[in-house]
């Protein structure tokens, strides 16, 4: 027997039993972003490696350790996208979307990072991202947070997530703070682990994000970034907090929140849950006002967020919020000479007459008992039964699979009866 080929570690199949919950989540996301007037954009999965090196940062874990990078036959270095913002910015610049106008965009799709697979963290994972270009006020930052809060309510998880906010200021604000932070860390060099020592010289703000409890203990005495913010950054953050207060959205200011990608400035935020253990962040984002210019476009303010769909699916499963629409409404049962053709024709008529109805025809033979068992297995609410007598009389038996009642109707009127049942 030939050896079975397995899926790549950390890259998972989404099976028919799982896809309805995914569809429920994806539909909720789409309806939410549409309610705010945002438009979908679709970018390639593969981009030039240089895009992520320039946008995300050479010294970040994503670029230095986690990307799937390869040379194509022309010798060009290409990468499976590890995140969506850089590609979205590239698409906007290349297609002149943000030269003279604001853009409010969203996208959804797979991302790739070579990490150690564990619950809630995979090598192929899916994100929904929302990006806004051309607006620099705190009002649009607040709208994005309000958008996510609306999605949590629609999914029923709003009581199981909490919002953390911070302002990391402008590049100029951070320059003086970085100097003060490095000086502080050098005084405690013996406490720092190797990862923190590396970050101290490459991106010292990321030390604030450490999970090492010994380092966390000394950071309580570290310089506070808020004390180094300029007046514009302070006013922007105060405006955001005021808008969230007015909207009734609760939040905590976390001065150690810095996010893991280099392009952020001013507002950063995360939605966190306690339902998933270690992998607690389900959504994160912030401002990246310098990224468009950094990638060759004109100076353009921008803000966005991304949410991990696998983690949201895990949350829905953990909280037992898995009620999804059944996959089949009507099952067509046929037995006897000439019944299959009539049954398939009747199924097509139902699809034409009732928008969105899902009709499954039985194939492969079998007696009525076997066919009704299959109808029950796929979750059908109604069965249409056609035997030779029904075909001869142009009728069909409609059986309510929930209540058990059944009636015989003319084939021309059965669509109206089914519409009332489902």
Curated annotation (Swiss-Prot):
EC number(s) reported in the record: 6.1.1.21
Biological process according to GO: histidyl-tRNA aminoacylation
One of the record's GO cellular component terms: cytoplasm
InterPro entries: aa-tRNA-synth_II, aa-tRNA-synth_II/BPL/LPL, Anticodon-bd, Anticodon-bd_dom_sf, His-tRNA-ligase, HisRS-like_core, HisRS/HisZ, HisRS_anticodon
GO molecular function: ATP binding; histidine-tRNA ligase activity
EC category: ligase
Subcellular location: Cytoplasm
Presence of the UniProt keyword Aminoacyl-tRNA synthetase in the record: yes
CDD domains from the UniProt entry: HisRS-like_core, HisRS_anticodon
Catalytic activity: tRNA(His) + L-histidine + ATP = L-histidyl-tRNA(His) + AMP + diphosphate + H(+)
Principal location: cytoplasm
Keywords from the UniProt entry: Aminoacyl-tRNA synthetase, ATP-binding, Cytoplasm, Ligase, Nucleotide-binding, Protein biosynthesis
Assembly and binders: Homodimer.
Family label: Belongs to the class-II aminoacyl-tRNA synthetase family.
Listed PANTHER family: HISTIDINE--TRNA LIGASE, MITOCHONDRIAL-RELATED, HISTIDYL-TRNA SYNTHETASE
Record-given protein name: Histidine--tRNA ligase
Protein encoded by which gene: hisS
């Amino acid at each position: 027997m030939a050896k079975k080929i397995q899926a790549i570690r950390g890259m998972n199949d989404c099976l028919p039993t799982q896809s309805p919950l995914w569809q429920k989540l994806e539909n909720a996301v789409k309806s939410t972003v549409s309610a705010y007037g945002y438009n979908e954009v679709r970018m390639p999965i593969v981009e030039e490696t240089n895009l992520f090196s320039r946008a995300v940062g050479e010294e970040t874990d994503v670029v230095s350790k986690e990307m799937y990078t390869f040379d194509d036959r022309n010798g060009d270095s290409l990468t499976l996208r590890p995140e969506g913002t850089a590609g979205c910015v590239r698409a906007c610049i290349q297609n002149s979307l943000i030269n003279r106008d604001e853009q409010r965009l969203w996208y959804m799709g797979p991302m790739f990072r070579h990490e150690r697979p564990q619950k809630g963290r995979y090598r192929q994972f899916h994100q929904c991202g929302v990006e806004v270009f051309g607006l620099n006020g705190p009002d649009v930052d607040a709208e994005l947070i309000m958008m996510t809060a609306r999605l949590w309510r629609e999914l029923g998880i709003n009581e199981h997530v909490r919002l953390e906010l911070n302002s990391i200021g402008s590049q100029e604000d951070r320059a003086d703070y970085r100097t003060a932070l490095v000086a502080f860390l050098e005084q405690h060099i013996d406490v720092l682990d190797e990862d923190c020592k590396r970050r101290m010289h490459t991106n010292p703000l990321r030390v604030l994000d450490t999970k090492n409890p010994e380092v966390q203990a000394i950071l309580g005495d570290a310089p506070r970034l808020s004390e180094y913010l300029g007046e514009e950054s302070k006013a922007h953050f105060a405006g955001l907090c005021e808008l969230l207060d007015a909207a009734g959205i609760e939040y905590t200011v976390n001065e150690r929140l810095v996010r893991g990608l280099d392009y952020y400035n001013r507002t950063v935020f995360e939605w966190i849950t306690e339902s998933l253990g270690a992998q607690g962040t389900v959504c994160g984002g912030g401002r990246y006002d310098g990224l468009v210019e950094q990638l060759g476009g004109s100076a353009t303010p921008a803000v966005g967020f991304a949410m991990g769909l696998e983690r949201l699916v895990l949350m829905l499963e953990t909280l037992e919020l898995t009620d999804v629409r059944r996959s089949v409404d009507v099952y067509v049962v046929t037995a006897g000479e000439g019944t299959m053709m009539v049954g398939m024709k009747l199924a097509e008529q139902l699809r034409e007459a009732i928008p969105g109805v899902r009709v499954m025809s039985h194939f492969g033979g079998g007696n009525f008992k076997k066919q009704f068992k299959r109808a029950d297995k796929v979750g059908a609410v109604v069965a249409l039964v056609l035997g030779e007598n029904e075909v001869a009389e142009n009728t069909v038996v409609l059986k309510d699979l929930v209540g058990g009642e059944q009636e015989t109707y003319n084939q021309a009127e059965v669509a109206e009866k089914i519409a009332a049942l489902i």
